[in-house]
């Protein structure tokens, strides 16, 4: 019995010894067949429970005479090794590969079923190259730059037919800096998520997708600073979920570049595309496209994002299925060049919230958005939209808002156009409190076309300015009115230098309870399809002989309102009314002919219209409260047989100085 027990114990011990993992080492510096047991020390073929270390400091090639069965974990410590599997498959048996050697190249065949791939685990400069139509599959995670000392590690996936997949995702720069992933020359790379720069020590990493290559991932994140994603020469990157580029406040000086017919598509699962949470990040799209499906895009992703920049140029397209937002502080979006197109299925939001953000659309670029809002949120300040040099913005029948929630903001249309606007809201909607110091300017042939109402100023706010200047510059609404909000102060519209303001129905300058409001027309044209009124303490100035204001209905001055004509060297402009002149007691008429007097004087029509005779009369307060410059000018009021006024003119005496010639 005792002998039997000893025999059984010996049998169990031998079985356990046979099952114990063996630590193999590759021993051939000239390379060889992975299925040749003499290439290992101890001699034998590794199994799934064994480990293998490659630590010969030499250049050599590993081949396979057949499919390679599952090994245990593999560690490549030294040397430059080519893995040439031919048409065979190496099944890693759900074990890891660690690369600390300078170079491992898979040049043919398939390496599959890795649980994890770590490149530059504890040392710098390790690289993995997958090329020549081979296949590399990792069931877990791919990590490049595993600790803070493992810098300059990288993966290269190259050539048509070459594929690399990482089911557990990819981290380029897990802890170490200067890590890289390059996918080039028609290769394909896919993973669950792509992270560039994972912790604060992992900086200055780069992912390049070049020359017709493809990367498919679920989410894309950049978490540190100095990193880059470059997509170029007809390459394509798809992130089916969220894109968070420069994800934290510490993420600065990162770059996303899409070049030469390449594409970046994001957000198929309704996750946002957030770019530039931290400062000073740049996105450049050149002759390429970015599309964001079922979600929104933000530059300066919250109030902390500052100094970030987006440039879309040279015929590129930027298409977002939801809204586009430029927020945070001092962030900039620039869209330019013929063929460049911006499409948002929702609003373009500038400064919501934020300070000092700029969006410019120029040089014949085009945009289609469903509403524009500049400084919509409370606390937003000094945000800017510029549309210039033949650029076009179609607002698709939605509102254009400037300074509704925040102030000191600007919309400049400089030789560009904004069309198909529902309402224009400067500082606020009608009779709603708004903010101060906003500017709308339409210059150098710029055009703003609204379908409905144009509102200027908000209740109790002040110092908003509208300027329409230059030949070809037009502010027009098609079927409604333009008005100043009640009790707004110092809201001034300048119409200058051959510009046109064309209002479909009523024009109301100033509001009841307001003060300092004005419309100043200087050698330009204003048209109203219905009545014109000047309300509260407000001015209408008609400056220069090239100016005119025409209304097809009543022209009304309330108490304390002033109509002022100022001459140039040629004479005065005109107000042409299609119906009666209404003037409440206290309304004022000022006629300043100082300049035309110096050029010789003359007689000039000021108020004309075929139906004035119906309502003008000798007691009209306007013609009884007149200030004339020079004082010896003469107001000429022409009446019909019933003593109704039909014309108001002024005769200005000549104040031309004599010329003295001195002959020596």
Q: What do these predicted regions represent?
A:
Residues 1-23, 664:
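Sec-dependent, cleavable N-terminal signal peptides
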Residues 18-101, 121, 570, 595-664:
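Solvent-exposed adhesion/ligand-recognition segments of exported proteins
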Residues 53, 383, 434, 438, ...:
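Extracellular beta-strand/loop-rich repeat segments of large surface/secreted proteins
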Residues 55, 84-86, 100, 107, ...:
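Feature marks extracellular polysaccharide-active and adherence modules
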Residues 65-116, 134, 213, 218, ...:
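Extracellular, surface-exposed repeat architectures
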Residues 79, 87-88, 102, 109-110, ...:
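Small-residue (G/S/T/A) turn/hinge positions that recur once per unit in extracellular repeat modules
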């Amino acid at each position: 019995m005792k002998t039997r027990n000893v025999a059984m114990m010996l049998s169990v011990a031998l079985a356990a010894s046979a099952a114990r993992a063996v630590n193999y080492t590759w021993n051939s510096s000239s390379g060889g067949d992975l299925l040749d047991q003499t290439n290992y020390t101890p001699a034998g073929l590794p199994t799934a429970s064994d480990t293998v270390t490659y630590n010969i400091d030499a250049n050599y090639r590993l081949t396979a005479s057949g499919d390679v069965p599952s090994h245990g974990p593999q560690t490549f410590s030294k040397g430059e090794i080519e893995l040439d599997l031919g048409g065979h498959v190496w099944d890693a048996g759900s074990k890891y590969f660690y690369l600390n050697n300078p170079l491992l190249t898979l040049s043919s065949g398939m390496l599959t079923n890795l649980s994890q791939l770590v490149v530059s685990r504890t040392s710098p400069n390790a690289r993995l190259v997958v090329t020549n139509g081979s296949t590399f599959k990792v069931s877990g995670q791919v990590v490049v730059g595993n600790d803070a000392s493992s810098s300059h590690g990288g993966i290269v996936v190259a050539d048509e037919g070459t594929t690399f997949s990482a089911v557990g995702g990819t981290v380029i720069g897990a802890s170490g800096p200067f890590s890289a992933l390059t996918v080039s020359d028609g290769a394909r790379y896919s993973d669950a998520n792509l992270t560039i720069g994972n912790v604060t020590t992992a900086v200055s990493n780069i992912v390049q997708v070049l020359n017709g290559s493809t990367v498919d991932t679920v989410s894309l994140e950049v978490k540190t600073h100095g990193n880059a994603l470059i997509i170029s020469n007809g390459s394509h990157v798809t992130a089916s979920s969220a894109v968070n580029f420069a994800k934290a406040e510490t993420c600065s000086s990162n770059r996303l570049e899409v070049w030469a017919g390449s594409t970046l598509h994001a957000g198929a699962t309704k996750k946002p595309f957030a770019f530039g949470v931290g400062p000073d990040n740049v996105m450049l799209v050149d002759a390429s496209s970015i599309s964001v499906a079922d979600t929104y895009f933000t530059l300066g992703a919250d109030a902390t994002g500052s100094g970030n920049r987006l440039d879309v140029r040279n015929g590129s397209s930027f298409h977002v299925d939801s809204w586009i937002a430029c927020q945070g502080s001092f962030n900039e979006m620039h869209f330019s060049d013929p063929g460049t197109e911006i499409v948002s299925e929702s609003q373009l939001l500038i400064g919501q919230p934020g300070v000092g953000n700029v969006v410019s659309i120029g040089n014949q670029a085009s945009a289609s958005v469903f509403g524009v809002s500049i400084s919509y949120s409370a606390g937003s300040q000094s945000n800017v939209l510029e549309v210039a040099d033949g650029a076009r913005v179609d607002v698709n029948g939605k509102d254009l808002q400037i300074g509704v929630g925040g102030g000191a903001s600007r919309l400049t249309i400089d030789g560009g156009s904004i069309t198909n606007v529902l309402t224009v809201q400067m500082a606020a909607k009608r009779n709603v409190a708004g903010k101060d110091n906003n500017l709308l300017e339409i210059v150098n042939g710029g055009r703003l076309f609204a379908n409905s109402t144009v509102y200027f100023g908000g209740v109790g706010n002040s110092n908003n300015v509208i300027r329409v200047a230059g030949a070809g510059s037009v502010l027009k609404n098609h079927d409604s009115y333009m008005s100043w909000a009640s009790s707004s102060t110092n809201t001034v519209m300048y119409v200058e230098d051959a510009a046109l303001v064309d209002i479909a129905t009523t024009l109301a300058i100033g509001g009841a309870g307001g003060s300092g409001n004005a419309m100043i027309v200087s050698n330009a044209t204003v048209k109203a399809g219905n009545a014109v009124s000047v309300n509260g303490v407000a001015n209408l100035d008609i400056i220069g002989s090239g100016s005119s204001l025409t209304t097809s209905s009543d022209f009304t001055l309330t108490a304390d309102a002033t109509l002022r004509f100022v001459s140039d060297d040629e004479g005065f402009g005109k107000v042409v009314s299609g119906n009666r002149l209404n003037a409440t007691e206290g309304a004022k008429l000022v006629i300043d002919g100082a300049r035309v007097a110096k050029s010789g004087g003359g007689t000039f029509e000021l108020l004309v219209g075929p139906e004035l005779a119906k309502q003008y009369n000798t007691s009209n307060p306007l013609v009884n409260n007149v200030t004339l410059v020079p004082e010896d000018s003469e107001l000429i009021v022409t009446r019909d047989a019933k003593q109704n006024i039909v014309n108001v003119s002024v005769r200005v005496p000549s104040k031309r100085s004599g010329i003295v010639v001195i002959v020596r």
